[in-house]
């Protein structure tokens, strides 16, 4: 199915997300910090990326801007996840949120699955996230 890259420094969250995505039939990989995340994104050319908004070394906004400048990832939909920020804070901070969504941690499993399906299908959210 889809190629999905997770960039998050929380090993437990990443392990859970990888398990869910692989169970759903997706090819999924992860990076624990922004620099290796950028390298994997360039090589993998994912269909969707899941980013933690607060990581050591870079904010989600900085990583987002770098991903948008890269030809391999400039159109890739991005799902931001954070336990520390609101959707409005995040989506207002980035310059072009087109195709981007937000889920608050802890993530509810059905919300996560629905959001992934919608984003991969290019659909708009059914309700505010």
Label the model's feature ranges:
Residues 25-32, 40:
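Short hydrophobic/Thr-rich beta-strand motif most characteristic of the beta2 strand and flanking loop
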Residues 8:
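Conserved acidic carboxylate
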Residues 45-47, 72-77:
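His-Asp phosphorelay/catalytic-motif detector in bacterial-type signaling
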Residues 52, 82:
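Active-site residues of response regulator receiver
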Residues 14, 56, 86:
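The feature encodes the CheY-like receiver
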Residues 62, 85-104, 110, 114:
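Alpha4 helix (beta4-alpha4-beta5 surface) of REC/receiver domains from two-component response regulators
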Residues 32-36, 59-65:
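Acidic catalytic/metal-coordinating carboxylates
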Residues 15-23:
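Charged docking surfaces used in two-component/phosphorelay signaling
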């Amino acid at each position: 199915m889809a190629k999905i890259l997770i960039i998050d420094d929380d090993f437990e969250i990443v392990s859970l997300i990888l398990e869910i995505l692989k169970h759903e039939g997706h090819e999924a990989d992860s990076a624990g910090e922004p620099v290796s995340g950028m390298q994997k994104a360039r090589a993998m050319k994912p269909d969707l990326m899941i980013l933690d908004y607060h990581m050591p070394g870079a904010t989600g906004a900085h990583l987002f801007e770098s991903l948008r400048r890269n030809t391999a990832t400039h159109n890739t939909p991005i799902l931001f996840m954070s336990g520390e920020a609101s959707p409005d804070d995040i989506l207002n901070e980035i310059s072009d949120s087109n195709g981007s969504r937000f889920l608050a941690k802890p993530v509810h499993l059905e919300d996560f699955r629905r959001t992934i399906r919608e984003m991969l299908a290019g659909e708009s959210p059914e309700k505010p996230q």
